[in-house]
Structures are given as C-alpha cells and as structure tokens.
Design a protein with these regions (language model features):
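Nucleotidyltransferase catalytic core that binds NTPs
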Residues: 1-178
C-alpha cells in the first residue's frame, strides 16, 4: 500500500516489499468529479462557491439569497445585495441556476466564467433550481431578494402553465417554505 501510494503521488519509493513470485502490485487510479460536474449530472443539489474559490457540495446555506444570471455581475446587483443585507441583517449569497426556464443550460466553461466575477468578492451558490418554488425548497427559511425584472416573471402565469390559479398555489407554497 505504501509503495502504491508513493507511486501514485509521483514519489519514488525505495521500500523493498519482498514480493514473492505469486504476489503482484496493482495500482488503480480513480478521478474525483468536480463539484460543478456533480451538479450538472444531478448528483448534487447545490455547490457553494466561496470568495476564495473553494467549492463545497450541498453545504447548508443560511443567508439572504439573491438569484440572477449575472451576465454580467453589475453595480445594480451589488447595490441590491447591500440593501438586502442591511434590511435582513444576514449575509447575502448570490444564486446562479445552471438551468433556466427561458434559456438553455449553462456549459461548464460559461459557469466558471460567470463565477470568476465573484472571486474575492462574494459567495455564490450554484443550483439546478429553475423556479422559485424549487429555490424555496432548497433554501427553507432563507429570504430572497429579487429585482424588478424577476418580480415581473415571478407573477407571470406563463411560468405556471398559463394558469393564475397555479401561480397563486406556487406562491403560497413558496410562502409556506419560509
């Protein structure tokens, strides 16, 4: 085992194992998927990306959530986050869904490009939540802050099968999730 670990890490080992003719050393390498790959494959619910670039799969989030596409991350997002943080007294975390009701799914390179805007500045949580109902389930008890354009879409019946009743039911479920 020690020789296999040394070999796998690129270190030469002088350890004599006294292997007999019937013994053999097998080395097996297994790669670990990146957190973004796990999310895209549906094997993770969230990926929290910290300002220093560290990523954590399904790390609990207790913050104010500001969803957006962040293409680009601009002064309006920053000001909305500052206002929300001062009102709620909580840290604001930006949420970027890698899938969207209105757009094709984001590719890994595009996700990384959008995340690069936040390095050293803010925490981002990546999700696959296309709707606010799904977002509320992922972050129970977390307040959400949204801009005007998102508020208009939130109450548009077309996102609820063109049904005002479905929209009101979904909003009630979001409210119930806290």
């Amino acid at each position: 085992v020690i020789t296999a670990l040394a070999t796998a890490s690129g270190t030469e080992s002088e350890l004599n194992l006294d292997l007999t003719d019937g013994d053999r050393l097998e080395v097996q390498r297994t790669g670990h998927p990146e957190p973004i790959e796990l999310l895209l494959a549906g094997e993770a619910g969230t990926v929290v990306v910290h300002p220093d670039g560290r990523m954590a799969v399904d790390e609990p989030v207790s913050a104010t959530i500001l969803p957006g596409s962040f293409r680009p991350f601009h002064q309006g997002h920053r000001r909305l986050a500052e206002a929300a943080g001062s009102i709620t007294g909580k840290q604001v975390v930006f949420e970027l869904s890698v899938v969207n009701v209105d757009k094709p799914p984001l590719e890994p390179a595009e996700i990384k490009e959008r995340l690069s805007q936040f390095l050293g500045k803010a925490t981002v949580v990546l999700t696959r939540a296309e709707t606010f109902r799904e977002k509320a389930d992922l972050f129970p008890g977390c307040p959400f802050v949204i801009g005007w354009d998102t508020a208009v879409r939130l109450v548009a019946p077309r996102y609820y099968g063109d049904s005002s009743d479905n929209m009101l039911a979904a909003l009630a479920e979001i409210w119930a999730a806290g």
